[in-house]
Regions:
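TPR/TPR-like alpha-solenoid signature
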Residues: 2, 39, 73, 109, ...
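Structural motif corresponding to the intra-repeat A-B loop/turn of tetratricopeptide repeats
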Residues: 11, 48, 82, 102, ...
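Amphipathic alpha-helical segments of tetratricopeptide repeats
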Residues: 25-26, 59-63, 93-100, 104, ...
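Residue signature of alpha-solenoid helical repeat architecture, marking inter-repeat boundaries
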Residues: 32, 66, 102, 106, ...
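Residue register of alpha-helical TPR repeats
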Residues: 36, 70, 110, 139-142, ...
Length: 275
């Protein structure tokens, strides 16, 4: 049955997402439908760090009824924002149980994906992948992209670049097949390139990141991370002038309050220019 609300999301533009959800709220004709939309407005407030507003919207959704799994899922995400170890685990488990009981595999896999982040990573990832891979519903299969992406970054951070590459390739294949959002596809390609460079395959990494930038240019999208990775690729290939060019562009697109070590590395690649 898919997730009818997912197309309204743009996580890079919460304000526009909120406008779409508020417009959708006016179109809903049932309490259950309104409750579903309210949970997504609550998620937006949670992402903004406005937790009291998030809680109020979830309470409102819960009072309407009919969206219990979504309410628990978003309560879990809100709890996870506290940063406490294991925060959200109980809510995500409840959301998973509710979604499975109601036959909502989209929300069940979403909950399992969150449980893989806060709980037993391997067990919940395996369960979620099994559910998503065997599904006929593209709304369920969509979750293979985020799941493989999470596996890839976990392996990458553990120093397993080869394992990360395998997972990132699966994530990219899933994005190309099941996710209509081109930016998410290019983010998956970006990760593939990053793992390739970590394996000493900088020429292949550069080709991947050049493809990311070609899409961005055609779409009118500016992304400093694409330029940053290409600068690293070119530096590894001793293409110093090209590395400087892309490092400078990445610096132009990087906020002054960004991670200081990242800025220092970009300045080094750019030839220590003034910002």
């Amino acid at each position: 049955m898919g997730d009818r609300l997912r197309p309204l999301w743009d996580f890079s533009d919460l304000d526009s997402s909120e406008l779409r959800f508020r417009a959708q709220l006016e179109l809903e004709t049932t309490d259950a439908g309104r409750a579903e939309v309210l949970t997504q407005l609550a998620r937006i407030e949670g992402l903004r760090g406005r937790f009291e507003r998030c809680d109020a919207l979830l309470d409102e959704a819960e009072a309407l009824g009919g969206a219990e799994a979504r309410v628990e899922l978003e309560r879990g995400r809100r709890e996870r924002s506290s940063g406490r170890p294991g925060a959200g685990l109980t809510e995500f488990e409840h959301a998973f149980q509710l979604a499975r009981a109601s036959g909502d595999d989209v929300l069940a896999v979403d909950a399992a994906h969150m449980l893989a982040i806060v709980g037993d990573t391997e067990a919940w990832t395996a369960r979620a992948v099994e559910m998503a891979a065997s599904a006929d519903d593209p709304g369920v299969r969509y979750w293979l992209g985020p799941l493989y992406n999470n596996v890839g970054w976990s392996r990458y951070e553990d120093g397993d670049a080869a394992g990360a590459l395998d997972a990132f390739k699966l994530a990219l294949a899933s994005r190309e097949r099941d996710d209509p959002r081109p930016y998410e596809r290019e983010i998956a390609r970006y990760a593939v390139g990053k793992a390739l460079r970590a394996l000493g395959r900088a020429d292949e990494a550069a080709a991947a990141h050049e493809e990311c930038l070609a899409w961005a240019a055609a779409a009118g999208v500016e992304d400093g991370y694409f330029h940053e990775e290409l600068a690293e690729d070119y530096a590894a290939l001793s293409r110093d002038a090209d590395a400087r060019e892309h490092a400078r562009r990445a610096l132009e697109l990087t906020p002054d309050d960004d991670d200081s070590s990242r800025i220092a590395r970009l300045r080094s690649l750019a030839g220590d220019i003034d910002r």
